[in-house]
Amino acid sequence: MDTIADVQSSVDKRNMPINQVGVKGLRLPLSIICAAGEQHTVADLTMTVALPAEQKGTHMSRFIELMLAQQGSMDFAALQRLTGDMLLKLQATAGRISIRFPFFRRKLAPVTGISSLLDYEVMLSGEILAGVYQHSLQVVIPVTSLCPCSKEISAYGAHNQRSHVTVTLISTEAVAIEEIIDLVELQGSCQLYGLLKRPDEKYVTEYAYDNPKFVEDMVRDVATALKADVRIQSFTVESENFESIHNHSAYALIQYP
């Protein structure tokens, strides 16, 4: 049998290294270990490695092979092992894996206690650079925000809206997804719920009215709570308020340190 040419392993003469090359948008079923146990989801993966200047291409099929051979659930330690395995399989010195997935949490309505699910967007990332591993967690948490100015100047009522608070953090050890959700939901004007009956709707309306927050208040309060956690080395907090009285959003961001 004739030998099949391995073009990607040939020499490239342009003397241009590539920071990240690999696969993006790879969708696979995955089990995530969380504080409540284990949750099955569908993940969207981006897997990349650094490519030296002299190598023409990476081995794209090896990324897929690595994930198809993956066994067990994903958590902080498993992602670190997987990132290391990727570098070995691709013969690379640096690489990154990002896993984005919907995360569901069961919540009880504040008055009736009716149970429902609420979804959150989560991304776990592991990166090895210069021999050092770094883990990051990103969670997008929807909350209600009610405008303090609108409340102050109005004879009755105040404009309120849904807000997305995005926390991206780098930690020295595992931080549970639920911990970040709890932390952020405590800082909103009110939490969101998948299902509410009339007594619950009355409660959340009045609760938000009693806890008005500007977008600036939101990011400052969340950042203050994150700074108190010794496991967290650095973080970014973003809040986007989808203004109910405008056709644009209010936005704020804090980076620490």
List each model region and its residues:
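N-terminal intrinsically disordered, cationic/polar leader segments
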Residues: 1-257
